[in-house]
A protein has these predicted regions:
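Bacterial Sec-dependent N-terminal signal peptides
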Residues: 1-30, 361-364
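Residue-level detector of functionally pivotal "anchor" positions at catalytic/ligand-binding pockets or at interdomain
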Residues: 29-42, 355-381
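A short, well-structured edge-of-sheet supersecondary motif
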Residues: 58-87, 316-317, 323-327
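Active-site SXXK
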Residues: 76, 93-119, 146, 188-192, ...
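Catalytic-site signature segments of enzymes, centered on catalytic residues
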Residues: 89, 152-228
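Active-site helix/loop module of the DD-peptidase/beta-lactamase fold
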Residues: 113-151, 198-229
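Penicillin-binding protein/beta-lactamase superfamily catalytic region
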Residues: 172, 211-320, 333-338
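C-terminal tail/sorting-segment detector
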Residues: 388-405
Length: 405
């Protein structure tokens, strides 16, 4: 019991400190791109003392790692914007799990408008029997547990995208286990649609897209993929950088929810808020394995960075201390990661060397030296006697290997 309360005190301290840090390091945004049209002010890289040689090295790295598009915003203005491998500024691309962070904002907006309360049971909105849990177990699952990845629904040896009740059965009490389980997240769409009485795309279009000039939509299949062009992704990042405000208008005005969203949400994974990844924490977990890594999620990145991360390197990095947004879309950069954390760390190595005073000696074909530090099965046990194994490396990379016998 004492350990539990000490965890709660730690979270309260981290939340208070992070709120103060985020608010004091965020700049007063003086520039926002127009809601309509293609006009968007730029800032010369030379104003940031970035050298063209180092920029070229970064772009080569991006191209060699299957990047489709890349944007860096500073003070809301475009410093770098590159389209590669057949992509263009009008091409729509999927966000993958980076859309989880978008959904967190939408849930917050629905709560702000009184449609739902994240302390409510999920069953309040989508009815009973949405899982194979007992009635009491199901009632104990709240919307906030879906946001925190702590529903306790089984994530071992199942289709993580299956939202049928037969796929969703009890493993642990909510808040006792952090697990990156896609199905409870996918059901947030049903929660929002039931609560608001609107389709998810209609609600997003009214409350977000038309307010900040975004263009994007969720697909109709059960994977819930969100599609947009790259600048729309950057606009969303700019909105969150400015704490839910856009050019004087409050898009998400609930500051309590906003700060809960971008800070540690539970004691199990310090580096996870409400569907947002948080840098600079003492430890972190990654998808699909019950293992806690020491240190921050991205050691090369600023400690105040928050990120929306998706499969195959879909990335939105938000850095309040630098008033900067970094967006990457593309195909798999070959990091063998369920999310983009390892690739994101590599990316930051190049970003950190953009200044003319830096010497960029990286080869675009080089790989970080790494060693295996642990081999576990899907349950998190140290073993090599399993058909499915997860190899954990010193740089945070995780490889899933299927052993054929």
């Amino acid at each position: 019991m004492r350990s539990f309360f000490s965890h709660i005190l730690i979270i309260k301290y981290l939340l208070f400190f992070s709120i103060v840090f985020f608010s004091t390091t965020s700049y007063t945004q003086s520039y926002f791109p127009p809601i309509s049209g293609n006009s968007w002010d730029t800032l010369s890289p030379s104003n940031l003392n970035w050298c063209q040689e180092n920029i070229d090295t970064l772009i080569n790295f991006l191209e060699m790692t299957n990047t489709k598009s890349f944007i860096i915003l500073k003070d809301g203005k475009i410093v770098l914007e590159n389209y590669l491998n057949g992509h263009s500024d009008t091409t729509y691309w999927y966000w993958a799990s980076a859309a989880k962070s978008l959904m967190a904002v939408i849930v917050g907006k629905a709560q702000e408008e009184g449609y739902l309360n994240i302390e409510d049971s999920t069953s309040t909105y989508i009815g009973s029997g949405w899982t194979s849990c007992s009635s009491s177990q199901e009632r104990n699952i709240k919307i906030k547990h879906q946001l925190m990845m702590t529903t306790g629904i089984n994530d071992i040896g199942v289709d993580l995208n299956c939202i049928d009740d037969t796929c969703l059965f009890f493993l642990d009490t909510p808040n006792n286990r952090w697990a990156y389980h896609n199905a409870p997240y996918l059901l947030l769409r049903d929660v929002v649609e039931s609560a608001t009485g609107q389709g998810i795309n209609m609600y997003i279009n009214q409350k977000l897209n038309t307010q900040i000039g975004m263009f994007g939509f969720f697909g109709v299949n059960n994977t819930n993929l969100f599609y947009s062009n790259t600048r729309s992704m950057a606009r969303f990042g700019l909105l969150v950088l400015n704490q839910g405000k856009w050019n004087g208008s409050s898009i998400l005005n609930d500051s309590i929810y906003f700060n809960q969203m971008i800070n540690t949400s539970q004691p199990l994974n310090e580096s996870y808020g409400y569907l947002w990844w948080l840098n600079g924490k003492n430890s972190h977990m990654q998808p699909r394995i019950q293992f806690t890594f020491n240190g921050s999620l991205n050691s090369n990145a600023p400690t105040d960075m928050i990120s929306a991360l998706g499969k195959n390197g879909q990335i939105i990095n938000i850095v309040p201390s630098k008033n900067m947004i970094i967006v990457r879309m593309g195909n798999d950069p070959d990091t063998n990661s369920f999310i983009s954390a390892t690739y994101n760390n590599q990316l930051w190595d190049y970003i950190n060397k953009l200044e003319c005073s830096s010497t960029n000696t990286n080869s675009v074909n080089s790989k970080y030296k790494k060693k295996v530090i642990r081999i576990i099965d899907p349950v998190g046990r140290n073993t090599s006697n399993s058909n499915i194994l997860f190899y954990i490396y010193s740089d945070g990379a995780i490889e899933k290997k299927i052993i054929l016998k």
